[in-house]
């Protein structure tokens, strides 16, 4: 997509050449990266991505990683970054660059349940999500497999519930089941029980162009069954950016958001007045961008990046020499 194709009064979605990248990097202090589909696919790093991030670190750029994936703790994500060659702090500071929805959901519940003695949450999610909640003092129940008990609805509804559950938290849960859905709805019949979703991604990119169903599918199921709307923590919700901003002291004018999804990464950047770069190694395509550019819907026009690259490795020439 050439610059002339961007249309409108403001030229956007420009290919980020090495020359433009040098100018852009001179204007920014902080780069925020999505992870899945940007830095890696599954357990395989995007070619050239580790070298690019190491070069950015060498130039003194501050890096942050904002991921909607709730299946790992901050520390586990930091370990993956180092294992795949992206570098990063070690020791007590390991994980401080990472802002995942597991960690930020824990911060959200700590705020919302402040003053509640011994707060407890029913978690449809991973042990990592439960661990982040436990780290801020929120007891977690429900993690792991849970099959249907009994022969029918009367038996399912007779299964005892944990007392004093004040929140239902829905993250990525490979053990999601009808039993869990039934329990979640029963907890949410209490009006003071919060419904929190880590993110609304409808699918998760893997290697070789494959995808699996994302957390958003599970959140929607609970919302529909409970007839409640979840508080969403992850991108494009501003809450996750506020978590980063509070810990990093970010100046939006000198910050770039780099991602592969228009409806999460780029929309978050647009909402928070950040510069945005779309990388084509993940979910969204230039055809998706063009559709948003040509739309009469102002909301869709927010999902148009300032720049795009085939891969974040395209930034490397601007960092060499």
UniProtKB/Swiss-Prot annotation:
Q: Which InterPro entries match?
A: HAD-like_sf, HAD-SF_hydro_IIA, HAD_sf, PGP_euk
**Which cofactors, if any, are listed as required?**
Mg(2+)
Keywords, A to Z, come to: Carbohydrate metabolism, Hydrolase, Magnesium, Metal-binding, Protein phosphatase
Which taxonomic lineage is given here? Answer: Eukaryota, Metazoa, Chordata, Craniata, Vertebrata
For this chain, the family text in UniProt reads:
Belongs to the HAD-like hydrolase superfamily. CbbY/CbbZ/Gph/YieH family.
Q: What is this protein called?
A: Glycerol-3-phosphate phosphatase
Q: What class of enzyme is it?
A: hydrolase
Subunit-level organization: Homodimer.
Record field: catalytic activity: O-phospho-L-tyrosyl-[protein] + H2O = L-tyrosyl-[protein] + phosphate; sn-glycerol 1-phosphate + H2O = glycerol + phosphate; sn-glycerol 3-phosphate + H2O = glycerol + phosphate
Q: Which NCBIfam families match?
A: HAD-SF-IIA (TIGR01460), PGP_euk (TIGR01452)
Sorted alphabetically, the Gene Ontology BP terms of this entry are: glycerol biosynthetic process; glycerophospholipid metabolic process; negative regulation of gluconeogenesis
Which positions does the site annotation Important for substrate specificity cover? 204
Answer whether the UniProt record assigns the keyword rRNA processing to this protein: no
């Amino acid at each position: 997509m050439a610059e002339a194709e961007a249309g409108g009064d403001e030229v956007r979605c420009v290919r980020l050449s090495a020359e433009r990248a040098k100018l852009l990097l001179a204007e920014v202090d902080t780069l925020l990266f999505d992870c899945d589909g940007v830095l890696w696919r599954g357990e395989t790093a995007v070619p050239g991505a580790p070298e690019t991030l190491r070069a950015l670190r060498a130039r003194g750029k501050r890096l942050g990683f904002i991921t909607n994936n709730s299946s790992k703790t901050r520390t586990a994500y930091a370990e993956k970054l180092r294992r795949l060659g992206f570098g990063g702090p070690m020791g007590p500071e390991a994980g401080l660059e990472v802002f995942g929805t597991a960690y930020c959901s824990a911060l959200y519940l700590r705020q919302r349940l402040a003053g509640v003695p011994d707060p407890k949450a029913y978690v449809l999610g991973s042990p990592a999500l439960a661990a982040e909640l436990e780290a801020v003092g929120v007891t977690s129940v429900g993690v792991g497999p849970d099959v249907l008990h009994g022969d029918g609805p009367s038996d399912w509804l007779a299964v005892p519930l944990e007392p004093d559950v004040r929140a239902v938290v829905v993250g990525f849960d490979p053990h999601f089941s009808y039993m869990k859905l039934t329990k979640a709805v029963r907890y949410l019949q209490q009006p003071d029980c919060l419904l929190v979703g880590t993110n609304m991604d409808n699918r998760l990119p893997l290697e070789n162009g494959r995808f699996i169903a994302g957390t958003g599918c599970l959140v929607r199921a609970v919302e529909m069954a409970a007839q409640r709307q979840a508080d969403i923590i992850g991108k494009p919700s501003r809450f996750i950016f506020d978590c980063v901003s509070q810990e990093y002291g970010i100046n939006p004018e000198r910050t770039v958001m780099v991602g592969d999804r228009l409806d999460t990464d780029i929309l978050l950047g647009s909402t928070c007045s950040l510069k945005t770069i779309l990388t084509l190694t993940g979910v969204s395509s230039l055809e998706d961008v063009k559709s948003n550019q040509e739309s009469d819907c102002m909301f869709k026009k927010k999902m148009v990046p300032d720049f795009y690259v085939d891969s974040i490795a395209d930034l490397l020439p601007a960092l060499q020499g």
